[in-house]
Amino acid sequence: MTKRLILASQSPRRKELLNLLQIPYSIIASRTEEKLNRNLSPEENVQCLAEQKAGAVLAENPDAVVIGADTMVCIDGECLGKPHDREEAAHMLRRLSGRSHQVITAVSIQTHDRKETFCDTTEVTFWPLSEDDIQLYIETKEPMDKAGAYGIQGKGALLVKKIDGDFYSVVGLPVAKTMRALKEFNIKA
């Protein structure tokens, strides 16, 4: 018997990406508090957050297969979260301007007796951005709910010079790796 699949996320981008697999699922947002542990690497932190999100939803739905995911943007060893205001968004975009950074997405798939967590890292390089470029992009309000203050799937694509890795991982869910991992839980596209 196939278990019910739950996406532990409110992210519209993750929902769109999971829809690509054309498998039935429901959404139950995880209510975990996202706190970084300064003693862990960015990869370890993003994996812990993905595991916490999936685990919290699994605790309330023990007969399900739960997917939790988290994405971080890192530059110079520092992780950039979602900006709190326009000024912080501008500061993040100035840091990313003309440089390469890493986007790390972790996915944790869990059942009551099994857990598989993996991490995917993609390198993204921005074009050099003028102050006008930054302010015009912030005016779109797109940066405000995204790690690193940009969305590669939207107008933020105009900031990107090059990407080395999985585009969908940058958006928030490495679809091909997720599909392969779900097969191990007998959930097939």
Curated annotation (Swiss-Prot):
Its EC number is 3.6.1.9
Enzyme kind, highest EC tier: hydrolase
Q: Which reaction does it catalyse?
A: dTTP + H2O = dTMP + diphosphate + H(+); UTP + H2O = UMP + diphosphate + H(+)
Q: Where is this site: Important for substrate specificity?
A: R13, T71, Q153
Q: Name one GO biological process term.
A: nucleotide metabolic process
The active site of this protein is located at D70 (proton acceptor)
Name of the protein in its database record: dTTP/UTP pyrophosphatase
Q: Which GO terms describe its cellular component?
A: cytoplasm
Q: Which InterPro entries match?
A: ITPase-like_fam (IPR029001), Maf-like (IPR003697)
Cellular compartment(s)? Cytoplasm
What is the purpose of this protein?
Answer: Nucleoside triphosphate pyrophosphatase that hydrolyzes dTTP and UTP. May have a dual role in cell division arrest and in preventing the incorporation of modified nucleotides into cellular nucleic acids.
**Organism for this UniProt entry:** Bacillus velezensis (strain DSM 23117 / BGSC 10A6 / LMG 26770 / FZB42) (Bacillus amyloliquefaciens subsp. plantarum)
Family note: Belongs to the Maf family. YhdE subfamily.
This protein's gene is called maf
User: Any idea which UniProt keywords this protein has?
Assistant: Cytoplasm, Hydrolase, Nucleotide metabolism
MF terms from GO for this chain are: dTTP diphosphatase activity; UTP diphosphatase activity
Cofactor(s) named in the record: a divalent metal cation
